[in-house]
A protein has these predicted regions:
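Cross-family detector of peptidyl-prolyl cis-trans isomerase
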Residues: 1-196
Length: 196
């Protein structure tokens, strides 16, 4: 806790002096420490049920660390299955199958987002070898004030116009699962990370 307090004090100083690089490095360090503390408070059992209609999908009922290797350097991601068990499960499943190995970045918006996971060829997602069909992962939304996770519904559908998700897209490097503009249940393999 003392180290975190020092980090927060340093963040204030770097913010005042507009030292962007020191601020980002210190913020990463603080977030790592917070993540370490969070591990002490994780439930021993998975805290809620997943609808049976998704029993055929892989799931992560906890957290995992994944190394992401790119031509520009390596990163480590913490994948949160407590708040998005099906999305996290699909990502871990595909990672363990080396699905993402050597796939290019297929979307890059400067200072905003990078996206990958589009397989080489005509397919736009992961084809399940058992069914020869594209595997789809539903949109998962978890809101701190709610006891359950919502599947295939948007904030607007649910009437939560001003709510913030448990996993907000507010930190450099945050990962997200890609869905098309036309359906909320068609995420398959593509993911993105924010650059701001």
């Amino acid at each position: 806790f003392l180290e975190l307090k020092e980090n927060f004090d340093s963040l204030q100083d770097y913010s005042k002096s507009k030292d962007k690089y020191s601020f980002i490095a210190t913020r990463r360090n603080a977030l790592d420490k917070i993540g370490g503390l969070e591990e002490y408070f994780l439930p021993k059992e998975f805290p809620y049920s997943i609808p049976q209609e998704f029993d055929n999908l892989p799931r992560l009922l906890g957290r995992a660390k994944v190394n992401i290797k790119t031509s520009k350097g390596d990163m480590q991601a913490i994948v949160d299955g407590f708040n998005a068990p099906l999305t996290a499960g699909a990502f871990i499943d595909l990672s363990s199958k080396n699905f993402y190995k050597d796939l290019p970045i297929n979307r890059a918006e400067e200072f905003f987002v990078l996206q990958t996971g589009d397989p080489i060829g005509e397919e736009i997602g992961y084809i399940n070898p058992d069914t020869n069909m594209e595997r789809h992962v539903p949109l998962e939304i978890r809101i701190p004030s709610e006891d359950k996770t919502f599947y295939n519904e948007t904030f607007e559908d649910l009437g939560f116009y001003t709510e913030t998700p448990t996993l907000p897209f507010a930190t450099l490097g945050t990962l997200g699962w890609s869905h098309s503009n036309t359906a909320i249940d068609d995420g398959s393999s593509q993911f993105f990370f924010f650059l701001y």
